[in-house]
Amino acid sequence: MVREQRPVRRAELLLLLDLYAESQADRQQLELAISFAAALCLQSSPQSAWQLQRMCLAGEQYVRVEPAGVAAFRESALKALAECQAAPQTQLDQLLADALRSGRGRRVVLLITPRPAGIRHRLQTLTAEGQSGPGVSGITVLSAEQGELLRYCLPPDTGASAGSKAGGVS
């Protein structure tokens, strides 16, 4: 018998997080987006089908985490996520510039934002002005709303939900 070897499809992931928040409630809603980004950092490994290569956070400060080895990058990325602060004004243009400079190939650009419609409109404007370059079609804009993020991850079990499952009401 001949065993067919399939090539491993590896994609580089560029994670962009827009930490725009006007109120305390907006800031609290971004906590799930930050946790989602942290989970992506922890799941990224040389053996996975994708590997987190760069992360940019636009909040009170603009932070760019570049690769410096898998373990060092993961540690730096998690530290940046732990220390990031939301803000009513973020460096959106810098975030979009990093997204557009990412190039093509086996690269996935994921932009998590609480204002997806505004981001999509801005990307369309850049495309219409001819400033977008080749990368605009490769940017996935994901809403930071809880309902949207929970489609991709499950929140940790709380004691109440774990207790009701254990109780076995049928």
Kindly label every feature range from the protein language model.
Residues 1-170:
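Exposed, interaction-prone extracellular/peripheral surfaces
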